[in-house]
Amino acid sequence: LKILSAVLNNIETDQRLDKVCHSLLKFGYDIELIGATINGRPKLNKPYKTFLIEQKNQSTMKKYAEFNYKLFFTLLKKADKQTILLANDLDSLLPFYLVSKIKKIPLVFDSHEIYSELPSLHNRPKTKKVWKTLERSLVPKIKYFYTVSDG
């Protein structure tokens, strides 16, 4: 089975996703991590496949919108019936969810926080409302998910 995952962070330095990808690879999955070219193209030396989405926008909301738009079409192209989609956090859940419905393939949601409660959103009510709306509309529809928490 193939697993497609994505992160808007720098995939060269994202330790959480690197651990997940290494574990999945160890258990025999064909893993591909999709990332973004936020500050140029990182030199990637990973034992699993990687793919970078060209990012033009750097402002926060435009960056998320562009990444999710391009991620949707990337997932559509790469996913098939032998694919499991692994969404990491709320910031990329929408394209994963849509592709899982279109292709009728499983989606797993990895959430390590309640995204709409991030401290960086406390003084940004409009942005917080967008994330809260996505949380309320998508998370209850996810059949498979996991989280790691101290609580």
Residue positions per predicted region:
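N-terminal subdomain of nucleotide-sugar transferases
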Residues: L1-G40, Y144
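An aromatic- and histidine-rich active-site surface loop
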Residues: D14, I84-K104, V108-E117
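Short loop/helix-cap segments at secondary-structure boundaries that form the rim of catalytic
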Residues: N39-P47
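A short, charged, and often flexible helix/loop element on the N-terminal side
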Residues: Y48-T74, N123-K126
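Membrane-proximal helix-turn-helix segments that form the acceptor-binding/catalytic region
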Residues: F72-L76, L94, L98-I102, F109, ...
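Glycine-rich phosphate-binding loop signature in dinucleotide/nucleotide-binding domains
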Residues: K77-Q82
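Conserved acidic residues
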Residues: T83-I84, K143
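Carbohydrate-associated surface elements
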Residues: G151
